[in-house]
């Protein structure tokens, strides 16, 4: 009989970049004669809704279905899974501090690579150790500095929320940037 024990799962951590990510599922090396099978993905917090392209931040459960008959195994139409068949797509934004020479012109304290943050996220910044947060948008840019002294005295934190379409309470807060 076909069971989850005959399959091997590889790949448990991915970094969000807007692209689809999925682990590798194969039959174990010493297992022969299994027919073709279909891999399905589900968000851990909603096991009813199949995800066609796992690319959003979150934890996913992997299930195998529609195993075709092979030389040594019968067909199987139910779902097969294992407690270890999980993988995560983690939010890991690329945030860099200004590194060029100061020339008296204003330069943003940091830059954020947009492709590393999910669309529709709320991005905020704080320059007072997280006491006050300001939403970052086209009307409110990242604070700028013009001199080395200003740069040394400006500390900024970034907070990203609402990045997971299935949950409104996810929040990621950065380390301090200076």
Q: Model-found features: residue ranges?
A:
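Solvent-exposed beta-strand/loop surfaces, strongest in extracytoplasmic domains of secreted
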Residues: 1-178
């Amino acid at each position: 009989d076909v069971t989850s024990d005959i399959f091997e799962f590889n790949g448990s951590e991915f970094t969000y970049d807007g692209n689809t990510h999925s682990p590798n599922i194969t039959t174990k090396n010493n297992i022969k004669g299994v027919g073709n099978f279909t891999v399905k993905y589900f968000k851990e917090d909603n096991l009813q809704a199949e995800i066609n392209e796992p690319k959003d931040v979150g934890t996913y459960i992997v299930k195998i279905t529609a195993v075709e008959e092979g030389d040594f195994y019968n067909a199987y139409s139910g779902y097969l899974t294992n407690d270890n068949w999980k993988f995560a797509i983690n939010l890991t934004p690329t945030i860099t501090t200004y590194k060029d020479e100061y020339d008296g012109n204003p330069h943003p304290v940091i830059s954020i690579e947009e492709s590393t943050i999910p669309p529709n996220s709320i991005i905020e910044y704080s320059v007072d150790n997280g006491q006050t947060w300001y939403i970052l948008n086209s009307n409110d840019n990242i604070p700028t500095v013009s001199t080395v002294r200003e740069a040394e005295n400006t500390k900024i934190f970034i907070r990203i929320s609402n990045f997971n379409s299935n949950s409104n309470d996810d929040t990621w807060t950065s380390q301090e940037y200076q």
